[in-house]
Amino acid sequence: MLEVSNQHIDNKKLSDEELIIAFQNGNVAAFNELVLRYKDKLVNFLFRYTGNRDDAEDLAQDTFVKLYRSKHLYKEIAKFSTWFYTIAINTAKTDSRKKNRYNSISLSEFDPDEDKDYELTANVISPEDSANASMEHHYIQKAIDALEDYFKEVIILRDIQDLDYDEIAEITGLPLGTVKSRINRGREKLKKSLSKIYNNKT
Amino acid sequence: MQEQEEYMEIRDKLKNLPKIKSDDNFEIMLQQKINLAEAEMQTISEKQNYSTDEKKSFFKKIFTRKTNYWLIPALGTVVIILIIVTIYYPYKKTELIPNAPVSQTLSDKVSDSPNVSRQTTIEEKKIENKLAEKNTTSEQSSDVPPKDIKNLDGYYRGGIEKELSQPTPVTPMKSDELRIKKNDDIETINAPAIEEQQKIESKSKESEQKDSRIIESKKEEERKGGDLSIEKSAPANKDEVGKSGKLKGAKEYKKSDKKNNRAVTDSTKTNEDDLEIIRNEILEKEKNK
């Protein structure tokens, strides 16, 4: 028990990169330490990205499972947080694609004269979420959900997760200038949508 | 800086959003998912290992020395047998087919079935003609003297060269006869070989006649000369000898006949040489007497 507790203390002192290397060498306690460090950050990021807590929790668990299975793919060149957020965003994107396939409803079936398809997303905020969060937070989240995915991910990573521009560029795989412009354009869109929401509210 | 100030309000609002924390069951749920993933990985690895083990064991069974080293010569013999069966026998069959007596088989089928009337086609006729021609040409090329005594007499008379140049007579076979069914009447047609043989026989007869004429003329000349007698010259044929019946020099004739046989075996000698030898022999006999 002493050895386990000592190991736990040692893992707390280690950096993320050192922990993942320790896990690669077979130290499962290092993985547990990484889970403790990143589970809340990851759930928060994924909740803002998906707008659904349950989905966020599931996606966060899937991300950790991917980390567990593909630990050997990490190399010391990149920061662990960058690599880990990249996995999280990819899992979130694939999941959203799957859900969009099943939740889309075709209106052309009801109106045969119309050739265009109107796709409606079936994202519904649960009563629990709406009860917990204040109305403002709820509207902000609604405005974030309304953004396109490529604006959403950069704004969340920058303004909510407090990551650097360089790190965001690495995660998204975009040039630094593109990342900055996308962040500004996303903020502009968010501002407009929030003003509309507030105007409608008033 | 102006841009940052412009979006400062939104940035603050986003930063002030409440931090969502994971559930208490998060780690338990994560552990369950990890266990499931490990189980899947194990099944996949087991399948891969099973497939690799199966392959290894298969090759080991065949090629390892410890277990089945005796299989190597056995496999070698099997391979050799296969080669013999697949390559040697087919070639052997192809070699045998051309040597088979085609003429006999084809013609005998026609001739040996007299009760069964068969219609011979033009192609069969052509084949028969070709075969007959081949037989005649092959017999012409051979320098073997005829076995009949009549022909030997002909050689003795001095027609050796002619006989050698002429084709040896071919005995007509039943197979050379073709039976054609025309309006329920069976007609027999002689093959060209028979016709050729008949021609050859007629030629040989003519040559014999010529020889006999020459001999007779010689005898007459000898009579005129008064030195030579009929007794010491061999007759044209044995039949003639039989007819005359009372030849005094019968023993001498036998001896000369043997010598003639020897002369026939020496087929390389020319006709003129033979004639000279015969004359010399006759002269010597007369001198001895």
Briefly describe each language-model feature range.
Chain A
Residues 1-41, 192, 202:
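N-terminal module of bacterial RNA polymerase sigma factors
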Residues 14, 141-178, 192:
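Helix-turn-helix DNA-binding module
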Residues 24-25, 64-79, 98-99:
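Sigma70-family region 2
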Residues 35-53, 70, 144, 193-196:
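Amphipathic, Lys/Arg- and hydrophobic-enriched alpha-helical face
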Residues 44, 58-65, 78-90:
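Structural recognition of an alpha-helix C-terminal capping motif at a helix-to-coil junction
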Residues 72-76, 86-107, 185:
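Arg/Lys-rich amphipathic alpha helix in sigma70-family domain 2
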Residues 96-119, 131:
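Short, basic/polar amphipathic helix motif occurring as a linker/hinge flanking DNA-binding modules
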Residues 114-142:
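Acidic, proline/glycine-rich intrinsically disordered inter-domain spacer in sigma factors
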